[in-house]
Amino acid sequence: MEAAQGRLGPEPELSVGAEHQAATFSGRPSRTPSKPPSVRTLSGEEEAESVGVSSRHPRASPKTWSGSIAHGPELDTWEDKPSSRATPSGARGRRGVPGSEHAPPPSSWYPEPEPSEDQPSALRVCRRGSPGGVEMNVELPQQEGDDDDDEDEEAAAGRAGRSFPSRLQDSRSLDGLSGACGGGGSSSSGETGAGGGRRATISSPLELEGTVSRHGDLTHFVANNLQLKIRLSGAPPPVPPASVRPCLTPAPTPTIPPIDPDVLRDLERLSRELGGRVDRLLRGLGGAVQELTALSVGCIQTYRDAVDSLGEAVDMSIKGMYTLLARCEELERALQPVQGLARQVRDIRRTLEVLEALCK
């Protein structure tokens, strides 16, 4: 692509290049005399810019176009510099056709017919040499990868349920992204230069599901509608309605084996025995609880009777003590005359002693 479309000449000769370009897109030969453009070697950035500019022209027109460029005496200079013209690789190589020494035939004035879909169009550069100059027919095709990309996009969009306008918009945005990534890369890549802006991203299904960008060795993928995809992936499959279900579908075979009736009878008998034992256990437990309750009631009554009898005994003792005190007081009052008698007895005894002494 760089060999076919780059190196049109310096900036001061843009008017001449515009006239040739107008004659080329109109499909008719240019009748204005042209000046031989000076040939110069472009740097990597200028080559990338020329590739980006030229890659947009084939997309503008789906048909191939042919241009006629007449060169003057600088033919030898142009052919002697192989380093300034890079031969495209792959199917876009230069196919030289030996031209006549006379003017180009009238058939080259009009655009050539479109190539078929099965046969990919290629970049064709034909040199027709003449003593006065050289004529070069350049046929710039549409990108050969567009058909494959469109088929992949339609298939992936059909699976994802996206509409055709959204796929076209994604394709255009990805083309612009690919052009930006390709313009920032190295100019020595032959495949990028020969592809004419072909996508530098990864497979088409990823491009349809989101945005893919490359920064050096890293590839970034941003999915569209990530929350919706997560919700759809986690949603249970819808149950078909009853009207849609087939009526003649065979019933599923039971996975449980048939039950033996003897097992059921044994299970019933064992259940009854277990129930009887549980009933007897509950009855015994109830009787034991009743006995414990009666014993507890007897203990409580005995304690109450003991407390009552103890209280009565204490009351009787208290009453006896008070009665004894009262009797003691009565006895003291009754013994008061005895003290007088004791005094009289002492007086009589003294009198007797005096009489006994007089008698001696």
Curated annotation (Swiss-Prot):
One of its GO terms (molecular function) is identical protein binding. It comes from the Eukaryota. This is BLOC-1-related complex subunit 6. As part of the BORC complex may play a role in lysosomes movement and localization at the cell periphery. Associated with the cytosolic face of lysosomes, the BORC complex may recruit ARL8B and couple lysosomes to microtubule plus-end-directed kinesin motor. Residues 1-201 are annotated as: Disordered. Residues 144-155 have a biased composition (Acidic residues). The lineage of its organism: Eukaryota, Metazoa, Chordata, Craniata, Vertebrata. GO terms for cellular component: BORC complex; cytoplasmic side of lysosomal membrane. It comes from Mus musculus (Mouse). GO terms for biological process: lysosome localization; organelle transport along microtubule; regulation of endosome size; regulation of lysosome size. The keyword Membrane applies. Component of the BLOC-one-related complex (BORC) which is composed of BLOC1S1, BLOC1S2, BORCS5, BORCS6, BORCS7, BORCS8, KXD1 and SNAPIN.
